[in-house]
């Protein structure tokens, strides 16, 4: 038998007797130590944190859902604060993010909650729901639009937004903070190369 371990740095093939747990552990641990060492030499590409969810085990299901959705809202505001850009024309703080949930029903419920809940003063949100059960024509148009808007190659802190729909929202919204939120299921990950300012991932 042989054990094959691979990552983005290398592939190791080690001879090993079938069922030899101690040999497997030794080879695997050596591979992981080398991987951690290699990753430590790479530049940091993304940073993340775990958002605490304060639901109590004694809460009702409805209270747990509300608490969960509220934690998502709080994370969005925090991420917007840290990762927004400035619109060149209006000087408003703008961010584009994704809330990625596992299933369609929670995707729709999170979207509805984010559209109806209270946000900090001076904050407006625009929410789009994106999942695989949408009417195909709608989904096709959504995907075309998302591919256009989220193919952003600029790293500038000030952006001159040209998209007609985005521009309309920026020009007509009185709030100084505008957060564009895509609430999506894993369909967002299939063949998409979108550039978001932030993400909340279930």
PLM features per residue range, with description:
Residues 2-67:
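Interdomain hinge/linker at the junction between the two RecA-like core domains of SF2 helicases
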Residues 2, 123-125, 195-197:
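Short glycine-/polar-rich loops that comprise or flank the Walker A/P-loop
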Residues 1-2, 202:
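Conserved helicase ATPase motor motifs in RecA-like P-loop NTPase domains
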Residues 192-202:
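A short beta-strand element within the Helicase C-terminal
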Residues 48-182:
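Conserved C-terminal RecA-like helicase domain
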Residues 183-187, 200-202:
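Conserved helicase core region in the C-terminal RecA-like lobe
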């Amino acid at each position: 038998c042989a054990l094959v371990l691979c990552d983005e740095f290398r592939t190791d093939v080690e001879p090993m007797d079938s069922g030899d747990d101690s040999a497997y552990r030794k080879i695997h641990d050596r591979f992981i130590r080398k991987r951690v060492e290699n990753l430590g030499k790479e530049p940091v590409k993304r940073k993340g944190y775990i958002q605490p969810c304060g639901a109590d085990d004694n809460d009702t299901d409805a209270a747990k859902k509300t608490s969960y959705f509220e934690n998502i809202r709080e994370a969005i505001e925090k991420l917007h604060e840290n990762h927004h850009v400035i619109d060149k024309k209006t000087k408003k703080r703008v961010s584009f993010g994704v809330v990625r949930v596992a299933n369609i029903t929670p995707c729709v419920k999170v979207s509805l909650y984010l559209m109806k809940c209270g946000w900090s003063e001076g904050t407006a949100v625009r929410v789009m729901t994106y999942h695989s059960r949408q009417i195909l024509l709608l989904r096709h148009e959504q995907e075309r639009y998302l591919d256009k808007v989220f193919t952003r190659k600029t790293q500038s802190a000030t952006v001159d937004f040209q998209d007609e729909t985005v521009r309309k929202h920026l020009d007509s919204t009185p709030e100084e903070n505008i957060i564009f939120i895509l609430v999506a299921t894993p369909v967002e990950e299939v063949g998409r190369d979108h550039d978001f300012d932030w993400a909340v991932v279930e």
